[in-house]
């Protein structure tokens, strides 16, 4: 297939599977020997793995939406820059819903063969998402300053007297 045809398949997969949650198209778009390198080993093969990933994400973010900002294709590989948004209304790795909205940039790389995805790699900014959800606190300048002062005092207390 041409690079343009592969880009069209990439767009369709994100629109149908991820944005609409239409899991019935997984067998049509995902090869039986598909490997999702961004998923946990043991749950990363075949169309069923993609159905599981989509269902998990859409459970946590029912209004999940991937906006394709740009695609580059060469041969059988398509690289996409996407903006992902959604509202945390379901469990996310054991964390209860926060009701907060998130917006992140993802990079996804998909290799196609005979009109189906055979490999996927994803680069996500999960720490930023967790910060937006209020699940991770990153120290600000004041807290960092206090931490450094405490650490310096502790280190000074270990120095021999008179130094």
Question: What are these model-predicted stretches?
Answer:
Residues 1-163:
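C-terminal and inter-domain tail/linker signature
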């Amino acid at each position: 297939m041409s690079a343009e045809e592969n880009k069209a398949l990439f767009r369709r997969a994100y629109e149908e599977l991820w944005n609409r949650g239409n899991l019935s198209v997984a067998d049509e778009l995902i090869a039986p020997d598909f490997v999702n390198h961004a998923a946990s080993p043991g749950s990363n093969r075949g169309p069923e793995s993609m159905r599981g990933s989509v269902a998990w994400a859409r459970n946590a973010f029912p209004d999940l939406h991937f906006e394709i900002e740009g695609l580059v294709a060469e041969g059988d590989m398509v690289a996409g820059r996407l903006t992902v948004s959604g509202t945390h209304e379901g469990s996310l790795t054991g964390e209860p819903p926060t009701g907060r909205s998130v917006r992140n940039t993802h990079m996804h790389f998909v290799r196609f063969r005979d009109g189906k995805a055979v490999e996927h790699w994803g680069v996500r900014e999960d720490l930023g998402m967790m910060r937006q959800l209020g699940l991770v606190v990153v120290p600000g300048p004041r807290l960092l300053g206090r931490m450094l002062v405490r650490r310096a005092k502790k280190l000074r207390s270990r120095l021999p007297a008179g130094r």
